[in-house]
Amino acid sequence: DMKISHTGSNGNLAEPEGVKIAPNGDTVYMTLQESNEMGWFSLSNPPDVLQDKVTYSNPIHEPDGIWVNSDGTLICTAGEYDGTIGVHSLDASGKPVTQRFIKMADDLPSNWDWEDKRKGIEPEEVVIAEAGDKTFVLTTLQDAGAVVVYDITDPAIPKYDSGAITDMND
């Protein structure tokens, strides 16, 4: 029974939001949305209290969805509060070593519109897809009812690929 009861550096209580098991089948990564952190632990040797965590360098990322690529070297997170996709490189031990953030507002078509002006672009979930020698991150946008795709083959230089509003809103 691992406890997650700490307060983040932003003063908010850590609350698990998204979870993904790494390809090694042992490391669990989770987003801690309100405390603006990501935590991880070993399934084979879970701690009593979550110890391995990192605070996002973007103070308003507040991650929701999370995905780990097939070789466990990259994690993407959906920044629900700030409208970004986090692209984070991992070292050989699985610890995050770089944090990059894709600001989707810079890339989305100007004719896209949705109702929630307070929150704006609100990514919920992310998936990393690999096709040939390319790596992509796909994210869903809650209020726009959209899916957005970025090429992250070079995580340092993400490129907007495509997006579509699904027209499934009420």
List where the protein language model places each region:
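Structural signal for beta-propeller blades
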Residues: N36-M38, G83-I85, G145-V147
